[in-house]
């Protein structure tokens, strides 16, 4: 019984190798017998080689499974000529993956002007401490010019707008104003309580910006992604009273810098400007507290 089973198994192997007793064995046929069975038609064989990129995880246009033997199934329709690489077939079976909209170019002219304004801030502080008010007034005029050009370019050229710029512009203003107010307070040109109020508000706003950046960052949150200027997650919208407050603060700085040059440091109008600046600073802080989420626009893919 055992011998009969062995004989049947040997006959099956010989038959699969395409030769039987009494025929001349072929080494080529014996080798092909060890390979997987060949598809039932040449169309299936060609389709199997055509689908190899899909097995490797690649997404190529117009590749779909077909069965030439049964005739079932049809290839996915190819895109029309001239549709471009941005078009995509149903199901996302072709075309390159789209670039995330969160990435943007940070090297715009307004952003460079904001960085210039940040760089001028310590220079102005040094000139004020050294009581070189004539040069300080000229450098401050240059910093103010960069602020005006920054906003003008961003409003009139859409390709110069960026989410980074919406945060970098007010950040540059706050750094410039904070250094100027500390320096002018050191020079006894601005009272200490007013400087304390302005810096406290700016510190809270900067902390809020960092918090919003963390909260709007998609998971996994990494330091490289957090500090990547090209990866924008939110766009900030300052309130109207905040814009007015920034203008009033800069006017007070200009008036204080010019006071020792034109000898009106004890003017009553300068003191009225101190009080008005304190009022707009408090109103600006309250506006951010009141509107909160309305000042932040989250950017999504």
UniProtKB/Swiss-Prot annotation:
<keyword id="KW-0808">Transferase</keyword>
<dbReference type="InterPro" id="IPR043130">
    <property type="entry name" value="CDP-OH_PTrfase_TM_dom"/>
</dbReference>
<feature type="transmembrane region" description="Helical">
    <location>
        <begin position="190"/>
        <end position="212"/>
    </location>
</feature>
<keyword id="KW-0443">Lipid metabolism</keyword>
<feature type="region of interest" description="Disordered">
    <location>
        <begin position="70"/>
        <end position="93"/>
    </location>
</feature>
<feature type="compositionally biased region" description="Low complexity">
    <location>
        <begin position="71"/>
        <end position="93"/>
    </location>
</feature>
<dbReference type="Pfam" id="PF01066">
    <property type="entry name" value="CDP-OH_P_transf"/>
</dbReference>
<dbReference type="GO" id="GO:0043337">
    <property type="term" value="F:cardiolipin synthase (CMP-forming)"/>
</dbReference>
<feature type="transmembrane region" description="Helical">
    <location>
        <begin position="272"/>
        <end position="292"/>
    </location>
</feature>
<protein>
    <recommendedName>
        <fullName>Cardiolipin synthase (CMP-forming)</fullName>
        <ecNumber>2.7.8.41</ecNumber>
    </recommendedName>
</protein>
<dbReference type="GO" id="GO:0005743">
    <property type="term" value="C:mitochondrial inner membrane"/>
</dbReference>
<dbReference type="GO" id="GO:0036148">
    <property type="term" value="P:phosphatidylglycerol acyl-chain remodeling"/>
</dbReference>
<comment type="function">
    <text>Catalyzes the synthesis of cardiolipin (CL) (diphosphatidylglycerol) by specifically transferring a phosphatidyl group from CDP-diacylglycerol to phosphatidylglycerol (PG). CL is a key phospholipid in mitochondrial membranes and plays important roles in maintaining the functional integrity and dynamics of mitochondria under both optimal and stress conditions.</text>
</comment>
<keyword id="KW-0594">Phospholipid biosynthesis</keyword>
<dbReference type="InterPro" id="IPR050324">
    <property type="entry name" value="CDP-alcohol_PTase-I"/>
</dbReference>
<keyword id="KW-1274">Primary mitochondrial disease</keyword>
<dbReference type="GO" id="GO:0005739">
    <property type="term" value="C:mitochondrion"/>
</dbReference>
<keyword id="KW-0812">Transmembrane</keyword>
<keyword id="KW-0472">Membrane</keyword>
<keyword id="KW-1133">Transmembrane helix</keyword>
<keyword id="KW-0496">Mitochondrion</keyword>
<comment type="similarity">
    <text>Belongs to the CDP-alcohol phosphatidyltransferase class-I family.</text>
</comment>
<dbReference type="GO" id="GO:0003841">
    <property type="term" value="F:1-acylglycerol-3-phosphate O-acyltransferase activity"/>
</dbReference>
<keyword id="KW-0444">Lipid biosynthesis</keyword>
<keyword id="KW-0225">Disease variant</keyword>
<keyword id="KW-1208">Phospholipid metabolism</keyword>
<keyword id="KW-0999">Mitochondrion inner membrane</keyword>
<dbReference type="GO" id="GO:0032049">
    <property type="term" value="P:cardiolipin biosynthetic process"/>
</dbReference>
<dbReference type="GO" id="GO:0047144">
    <property type="term" value="F:2-acylglycerol-3-phosphate O-acyltransferase activity"/>
</dbReference>
<dbReference type="InterPro" id="IPR000462">
    <property type="entry name" value="CDP-OH_P_trans"/>
</dbReference>
<feature type="transmembrane region" description="Helical">
    <location>
        <begin position="133"/>
        <end position="153"/>
    </location>
</feature>
<feature type="transmembrane region" description="Helical">
    <location>
        <begin position="109"/>
        <end position="129"/>
    </location>
</feature>
<feature type="transmembrane region" description="Helical">
    <location>
        <begin position="250"/>
        <end position="270"/>
    </location>
</feature>
């Amino acid at each position: 019984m055992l011998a009969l089973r062995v004989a049947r198994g040997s006959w099956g192997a010989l038959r699969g190798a395409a030769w039987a007793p009494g025929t001349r064995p072929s080494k080529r046929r014996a080798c092909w017998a060890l390979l997987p069975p060949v598809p039932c038609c040449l169309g299936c064989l060609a389709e199997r080689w055509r689908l190899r990129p899909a097995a490797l995880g690649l997404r190529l246009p117009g590749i779909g499974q077909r069965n030439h033997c049964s005739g079932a199934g049809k290839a996915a329709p190819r895109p029309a000529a001239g549709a471009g690489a941005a078009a995509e077939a149903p199901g996302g079976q072709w075309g390159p993956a789209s670039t995330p909209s969160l990435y943007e170019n940070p090297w715009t002219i307004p952003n460079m002007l904001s960085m210039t304004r940040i760089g001028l801030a310590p220079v102005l502080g040094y000139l004020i401490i050294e009581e070189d008010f004539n040069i300080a007034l000229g450098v401050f005029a240059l910093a103010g010019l960069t602020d005006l050009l920054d906003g003008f370019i961003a409003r009139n050229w859409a390709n110069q707008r960026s989410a980074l710029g919406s945060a970098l512009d007010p950040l540059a203003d706050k750094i410039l104003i904070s250094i100027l107010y500390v320096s002018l307070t050191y020079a006894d040109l601005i009272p200490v309580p007013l400087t304390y109020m302005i810096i406290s508000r700016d510190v809270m706003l900067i902390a809020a910006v960092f918090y919003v950046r963390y909260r709007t960052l998609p998971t996994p949150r990494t330091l490289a992604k957090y500090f990547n200027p090209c990866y924008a997650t939110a766009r900030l919208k300052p309130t109207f009273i905040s814009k007015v407050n920034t203008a009033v603060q800069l006017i007070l700085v200009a008036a204080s810098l010019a006071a020792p040059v034109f000898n009106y440091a004890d003017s009553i109008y300068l003191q009225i400007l101190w009080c008005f600046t304190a009022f707009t600073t408090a109103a600006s802080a309250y506006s951010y507290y009141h509107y909160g989420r309305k000042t932040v626009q989250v950017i999504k893919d």
